[in-house]
Amino acid sequence: MVITMCCIVSFAAVAGPKIDTSPDRAKTALNPGLKQIGSLQPRRANEISGSNWTLGCETLDRDFADYQQYKEYIVPLGIKTIRLQGGWAKTEKVKGKYDFTWLDSIVDDACGRGLNIILETDYGNTNYVGGGGADLAGGFPTSGEALAAWDRWVEAMAAHYKGRVRDWAMWNEPDINKKHQPGDIAPFNIRTAEIIRRVIPDARIAGLSLSSSSPKLLNDCLKLLADQGKMDLFNWFIYHGYDFNPDISYQNVEELKVTLGKYSTQAKMRQGENGCPSEVATKFALSNYPWTESSQAKWDLRRMLGDLGHDVESAVFTICDFNHLGREINRKGLLWATADKQVEKIKLAYYAVQNCVAVFDDTLERVKEPVVGVVYDKSTASFAYRNKNSGRNLVVLWCNSGTPDDSFVTRPAQVVVKNLAIKEPVWVDLVSGRIYEIPADRIVKTGEFIIFKDVPLYDAPVLIAEKTLLLK
């Protein structure tokens, strides 16, 4: 029987550490030399109409994390869409028998909280000869028997979640298995997506799910899809592409968008997985670097707002640390977890992401013409946004010259905006969420320009914003 309505869930108290809702919940050493007048107010996911973000809730299919331990932290964060993985091996432990109970408990809980789900079709199943690998980098199913079994599982899963899950994604990071070439990836995407779309005609499907952000790899895969007339199966194409300095990725991102434009005017690129560790790691992306909670928070914000500024949907990887058995604990979570999956600490990045989500929702639109100029001793990124309802404006900017560090020391920047009215500007630090007054003697208005003198700037995003956008 297909369940078409989400269950109603009760919201229990958080079992782990309590979420701090005080104005100084995100504690840093920042001192910009300005008068603090307030703090950003977090917004729950059900208080936000829509936004650019997806939150990773991965690896539950392999029991590396426990949804029940972190579920109460999702809605207060403010992100409305979560990424889950389908788990063929966990669902079909006995050939021909599907037990979706484990996934139902997660999907129904998430739906009951008002969350949207993007469900990924992976990984393999060793019950079948040639059934592929059941973990990251495992190969696709290859034998005739295993491929037929894959098709049956995808169809059963799509039918089971029709009415509950509309958004779907293909097998995660097929390209990190070097046996998988475009000639393998594209046909496997086609067979999977065709089944989903037949069962759920209005499904929204993300193709490829590539680890790489290589324009050449994308082009090689898209050409095969286009040659088969299958581009219309897909609404998005996913890339990941980790970089120590998140800002250096955007030349590739723009090339990815141009590449996709050769084959489709409808589909869009989507960043499907990116995050930063909060401590030194020896395995996984961004390993062997002295990350801390401070640099993680900065990195996550720069990735989120860099993606938004380049008009790309963006994923935060991940809600909670997970114990990747046989490797090590992946510390990219916003929540710090023990080896036995218990949430022990809320990281600084949780509050930083919460601050970002509270400001940047779908009521803002990017002002695309060049309206911001920044004079600084290093390279910077900057973007301008306007509230579609009120017309009120803000600018976000940061130093993008290197990998985020642990320092909260700011240096002065001179910022010029053109044709962007900000009547009562405030300065906001997104890591801490603190809002500061900008002294009148640092603001010069001349014709269509506003000059902000000696704006505190460092390697994490800050705002110059209309006060009434943030403080009611």
Cite the ranges covered by each PLM segment:
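Bacterial N-terminal signal peptides
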Residues: V2-S10
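Mature N-terminal, pre-catalytic/accessory segment of carbohydrate-active enzymes
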Residues: A12-E72, P76-L77, K472
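Substrate-binding cleft and catalytic face of glycoside hydrolase catalytic domains
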Residues: L77-N235, G241-F244
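Noncatalytic carbohydrate-binding groove/subsite architecture in carbohydrate-active enzymes
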Residues: P182-G306, H310-S314
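Aromatic/acidic polysaccharide-binding cleft in carbohydrate-active enzymes
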Residues: C276-F360, V367-D377
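Carbohydrate-binding surface patches
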Residues: G373-A421
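Solvent-exposed beta-hairpin/edge-strand motifs
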Residues: V416-I435
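C-terminal beta-strand-rich structural cap/linker in extracellular carbohydrate-active enzymes
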Residues: E437-K472
